Amino acid sequence: MKQQQKIVWSGADERKRQSKPFDGEKVYDACIIGGGVIGCAIARELSRWQLSLGLLEMRSDVSEGTSKANSAIIHAGYDAKPGSEKARTNVAGNQLFEPLCRELHVPFRRNTSLVVAFSSDGLAGLRELKSRGEINGVDGLSILSQAELRRREPAIGPSAAGALLAETGGICSPYELTIALAAHAVLNGLDLQLNCKVGQIRHDGRWFHLQTSRGPVRCQVLINAAGVYADTIHNQLSRQPIEITPRRGEYWLLDKSVSDAFSATIFQLPTAMGKGILVSPTVDGTMLLGPTAEDIDDKDDVRTTAQRLDEILRVAAKTWPDLPRGQFITSFAGLRAHARQNDFILGEVADCPGLINAAGIESPGLTAAPAIGIELARLAARRLNAPRRSQWQPAWQPPQPFRLMETEQRARAVRDNPAWGRIICRCEQVTEAEIRAAINRPVGAATVDGIKRRTRAGMGRCQASFCTPRVLAILSEELGVSRLELTKFGNGSRILTGRIGETVRSHEPPAADAAAGGLEVSHD
């Protein structure tokens, strides 16, 4: 195996730190609210300057909001309105994406995208998108005839009349990218604070004073990357309010057995509510259908609904008539932060110097993240008059996944560490060694979902029904806590309620030790 960087993170120590109140007030030059891909991209770029930097995330891990539940598409940039922040940062971000993923060791594939017209009337819409894309500076756009489209994608529906090909379209793993951005920032001095929900904020003209669930925070520059909660942050400090509406999108995910159905990401012509229902491969070999678009009031409502999931199947059938309904392995939903002006809200707030917004970040926010990160980090550094750091640590490289190793690599890995030979997740071929490394790494996992997003354990066809008890046992051992205390995604989402044969009140703290057996699964 290739020699890996020395692990510099103790999962057990970090879990204890992230669950305790602060020892006094935290003071930073700059502080970011929000640990999604935007907040972490800003943090990574801002760690290039000599300043004290904090990031506050209310959940138990980074990438727990919009950044974990989206289409994972790197958009070319033809859809955004020319002259908008979306158009500008989309095209710039697309150009930055491939080298960024290479540097951070994150999977990325430029698989191209196709916008399909399903009638001759729709061909005019394709020409309009192509013209818009060219105004935005997008390269590699062309119109395909029906015959050319079928040669590229034989499974496309019979009513497809033509398509817009975008050669710069791509796919990535958004949660792996977010975790890697955060880890790189931490290696370069970021003070990441999880389980840290921001409440009241005031500005005294020089300092921002934040009350959080773990204690007080003070900073000179405050960067608002709070996703669907960005209006809650902004409106405490500015007399010019903004409004963010949660727009829920639901998805279906299909098994790897149908991964070769389409090579490109297939869009239908977009509407005012978004880019419509897509059919897309993922970098992990599964197939994704969705999303829907439903404006809601609840900023935490990520339920799936039978009505919307049926809508996906009905609309996607036009793209994929032979859609194999027996190959679905899960469904999920995510929220997009939709601003009233239908554009990103970026930059320093006019009536609150030092407050920098990254608000209203919906599609193409993932694509735009590298460009937004650079732009807003430079803005913050200029306001603080901070000098550039002379040294910057390279990104941490995780071990190569066992499933991607050649036979000789696997044999060598097992000889060096027998834990490489113990398969924990059969569907995704994830080993014990990978799970332990995912806990004891920069920005390591402390939950079952944290393990899932760092290793793919639990993401396969059985959806964690086999590996969950084994993952819990390893987490318990590495973190030094009872399995009864472990959660799926933090915030009280405990998986186990007690030992079989015992009565455990749901609100009492667990008293079992980490090695206790005979545990009962929660079905709440």
Where are these regions (language model features)?
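Short beta-strand to alpha-helix junction loop
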Residues: 82, 86-91, 116-125, 164-183, ...
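N-terminal Rossmann-like FAD-binding beta1-loop-alpha1 element of flavoenzymes
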Residues: 28-55
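Flavin-dependent oxidoreductases
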Residues: 41, 201-206, 210-290, 294-305, ...
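Dinucleotide-binding Rossmann-like beta1-alpha1 core, especially the glycine-rich loop
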Residues: 72-152, 276-277
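C-terminal catalytic lobe of FAD-dependent flavoproteins
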Residues: 180, 270, 274, 283-284, ...
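Glycine-rich FAD pyrophosphate-binding loop
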Residues: 47-69
